[in-house]
Swiss-Prot record:
Induction: More strongly expressed in the presence of methionine than in the presence of sulfate. This is Probable amino-acid permease protein YxeN. Its main location: membrane. It comes from Bacillus subtilis (strain 168). CDD domains: TM_PBP2.
Amino acid sequence: MNTIDWEFMISAFPTLIQALPITLFMAIAAMIFAIIGGLILALITKNKIPVLHQLSKLYISFFRGVPTLVQLFLIYYGLPQLFPEMSKMTALTAAIIGLSLKNAAYLAEIFRAALNSVDDGQLEACLSVGMTKFQAYRRIILPQAIRNAIPATGNTFIGLLKETSLAFTLGVMEMFAQGKMYASGNLKYFETYLAVAIVYWVLTIIYSILQDLFERAMSKPYRT
């Protein structure tokens, strides 16, 4: 029976780390756009804006119902067929767009639930003292909703971080693609993919710790 080459596995880490910036850039950029998109969708559905409300529900249903890999292929290979000017779009850009659109749909539901968790009476109270609806949301409603949405939003980011590994199918040289090439060159598949798994695991642990610290900081003003 073959044994695990631990020395080789350890030697794979420096190679994998070289692609870590691409992985993190993809995840962070996609999350920023997803948060913006998700918040807009949540506000539309919360306020039931005519036409936009129906379109947002359709958007959420589509991107939650279609596999992420199919979405990436539709964007990278399909859109240039309909819009030739998009043929210059890079694989990295397509991956960020795809991951942003998909996660915006999930975050929209998270943010909508967070907004609904804030008592409607607070909005009425803000309006009664002369605040505009925009001021009420910015100063009172959104800060509370954001606090309520942090745990689920953090879980979404962890999922997004792992989904960046799908970008290798478009040709993006992120961490999983780097590991795949390294394994093919040395025929040490188990050791290499185990090293890849450990890096992703460590990243999620680090992020979970940071999220926990952030949650505590956000909860401090509400403690009695």
